[in-house]
From Swiss-Prot:
UniProt GO molecular function: proton-transporting ATP synthase activity, rotational mechanism
Subcellular location: Cell inner membrane
Membrane topology field: Peripheral membrane protein
Job description of the protein: F(1)F(0) ATP synthase produces ATP from ADP in the presence of a proton or sodium gradient. F-type ATPases consist of two structural domains, F(1) containing the extramembraneous catalytic core and F(0) containing the membrane proton channel, linked together by a central stalk and a peripheral stalk. During catalysis, ATP synthesis in the catalytic domain of F(1) is coupled via a rotary mechanism of the central stalk subunits to proton translocation.
Protein name, as recorded: ATP synthase subunit delta
PROSITE patterns from the UniProt entry: ATPASE_DELTA
Length: 174
């Protein structure tokens, strides 16, 4: 775990537990993602890191636009001068949410785009294999030449042409 994730995880866990208790997971997920994107903007990041303006003052400018409970959470983060880690808090929140909902994320790397039916079939097969719901991130990377590389958690399934070539190459060289 990186230092950033160690700092962010307690915030994410507290946010998740609160949102789950009050049935606000969807709303808090969206709001955390929005704030995470906001603090990654270069101009906003410069303001946040400025010693001339407190992070609490920055958050107070959007107080009227936020749900009171979510504002209180973000205000706590600001009070602790941790607004810059909101992207990691959001990431950790989603990880906790996925575990809670028995969802795994599959990064599917393809050489070229494929049709929706094939993607749906692949998703169904992955859900059967891993006995859970799957959220798929499709990445197009022509370097793999064909086939697919699928990463789900610590499991990697490399059925790419480039992977097969590398395997064949190592066999021939040994």
């Amino acid at each position: 775990m990186t230092n950033l994730s160690v700092i962010a995880k307690p915030y994410a866990k507290a946010a998740f537990e609160f949102a789950n208790e009050y049935n606000l997971l969807q709303e808090w997920s969206k709001q955390l993602k929005s704030f995470a994107e906001l603090v990654q903007d270069d101009a906003i990041a410069a303001i946040i890191s400025s010693p001339e303006i407190s992070q609490t003052e920055i958050i107070n400018t959007v107080k009227d636009q936020l749900d009171e409970k979510f504002f209180n959470f973000v205000a706590l983060v600001a009070e602790n001068k941790k607004l810059s880690i909101l992207p990691e808090i959001s990431f950790q929140f989603e990880n906790i949410r996925n575990v809670h909902n028995n969802i795994k994320v599959a990064d599917v790397t393809l050489a070229y785009a494929i049709d929706k039916n094939t993607l749906a079939n692949l998703k169904t097969k992955l859900e059967e294999k891993f006995s859970c719901s799957i959220d798929m991130n499709v990445i197009i990377d022509p370097v793999i030449l064909g086939g697919a590389v699928i990463k789900v958690g610590d499991t990697v399934i490399d059925d790419s042409v480039s992977g097969r070539i590398e395997t064949l190459k190592s066999i021939l060289l040994s």
